[in-house]
Curated annotation (Swiss-Prot):
<feature type="binding site">
    <location>
        <position position="130"/>
    </location>
    <ligand>
        <name>Mg(2+)</name>
    </ligand>
</feature>
<dbReference type="Pfam" id="PF00035">
    <property type="entry name" value="dsrm"/>
</dbReference>
<comment type="similarity">
    <text>Belongs to the ribonuclease III family.</text>
</comment>
<dbReference type="InterPro" id="IPR011907">
    <property type="entry name" value="RNase_III"/>
</dbReference>
<dbReference type="GO" id="GO:0008033">
    <property type="term" value="P:tRNA processing"/>
</dbReference>
<dbReference type="GO" id="GO:0003725">
    <property type="term" value="F:double-stranded RNA binding"/>
</dbReference>
<comment type="subunit">
    <text>Homodimer.</text>
</comment>
<keyword id="KW-0378">Hydrolase</keyword>
<dbReference type="InterPro" id="IPR036389">
    <property type="entry name" value="RNase_III_sf"/>
</dbReference>
<keyword id="KW-0699">rRNA-binding</keyword>
<dbReference type="GO" id="GO:0005737">
    <property type="term" value="C:cytoplasm"/>
</dbReference>
<feature type="domain" description="RNase III">
    <location>
        <begin position="19"/>
        <end position="144"/>
    </location>
</feature>
<keyword id="KW-0479">Metal-binding</keyword>
<keyword id="KW-0698">rRNA processing</keyword>
<dbReference type="GO" id="GO:0004525">
    <property type="term" value="F:ribonuclease III activity"/>
</dbReference>
<feature type="domain" description="DRBM">
    <location>
        <begin position="172"/>
        <end position="240"/>
    </location>
</feature>
<keyword id="KW-0460">Magnesium</keyword>
Length: 243
């Protein structure tokens, strides 16, 4: 119990640096600092409550994801009355994309609050978006929907959500390319081939074929990333034909 208390309460005093920094970041006074401590606790600490349940940000991340989706959906519904379900879903996906959430987390420098047994430079890039979602979840638990809605509006919607700009933002180059190939009745294929790189991490190499011609090649640490990278290169190579 003392270990749990020390980890979660080490910064949880009102008037302390953690409280003051959070107050400035959120735009309002947090009430239950322990919720925010949990939002910045990484699973690598392997902390558990008396019932054996893990204490980390992952459940708050789930909650924050749902709150972001709800608030953004409500905003789009009110601001774009002419948008149908498909359009609104597409716009929401662009706003809450992993890339965008990572940028938000980086801009707020949330990683400075994270407690873990892993050096910060060894985290994957998605840590920034994950803890941003966890923070949103913590706000909801601490202050309710009103304050959560206000934070999302001030930090996400007002500075970043411009419908005209979003309409031109590509979520997935692979999806865009597949849609174009299908409309143009073109054959396409993503071929995984042997990667000859000497990186320590395993890489996947992909060739993108369109109408029996290699249009682009790419390599990355996952097949999905390599296919997206190849699709992006193909998109720019074929941009004049696709637009």
């Amino acid at each position: 119990m003392s270990v749990i208390r020390n980890i979660l309460n080490s910064r949880s005093s009102k008037g302390g640096n953690f409280f003051n920094t959070l107050h400035k970041l959120l735009g309002f006074r947090p009430k239950d600092l322990s919720v925010y401590e949990r939002a910045f606790t990484h699973r690598s600490l392997n902390v558990k409550d008396p019932s054996g349940n893990p204490i980390n940000y992952e459940r708050l991340e789930f909650l924050g994801d749902a709150m972001l989706g709800s608030v953004i959906a409500s905003h789009l519904y009110q601001e774009v009355p002419e948008g149908d379900e498909g359009y609104l879903t597409k716009m929401r996906s662009k706003i809450v994309s992993r890339k965008h959430l990572n940028e938000l987390g980086k801009d707020l420098n949330l990683i400075r609050f994270v407690k873990s047994n892993i050096p910060n430079d060894q985290f994957g890039v998605n840590i920034h978006g994950n803890i941003f979602e966890a923070l949103v979840g913590a706000i909801y638990l601490d202050r309710g929907y009103k304050y959560c809605n206000r934070f999302i509006y001030n930090r996400v919607i007002e500075p970043y959500v411009d419908i005209e700009t979003l309409e031109g933002r590509v979520i997935s180059y692979k999806s865009l390319l597949i849609e174009w190939c299908q409309k143009q009745k073109k054959e396409f294929n993503y071929q995984v081939y042997e990667d000859t790189g000497r990186d320590e991490l395993k890489h996947f190499a992909v060739k993108l074929w369109i109408d029996k011609k290699v249009i682009a090649k790419a390599r990355a640490t996952s097949k999905k990333k390599a296919e997206e990278k190849a699709s992006k290169r193909a998109y720019y190579a074929l941009q004049n034909k696709m637009n």
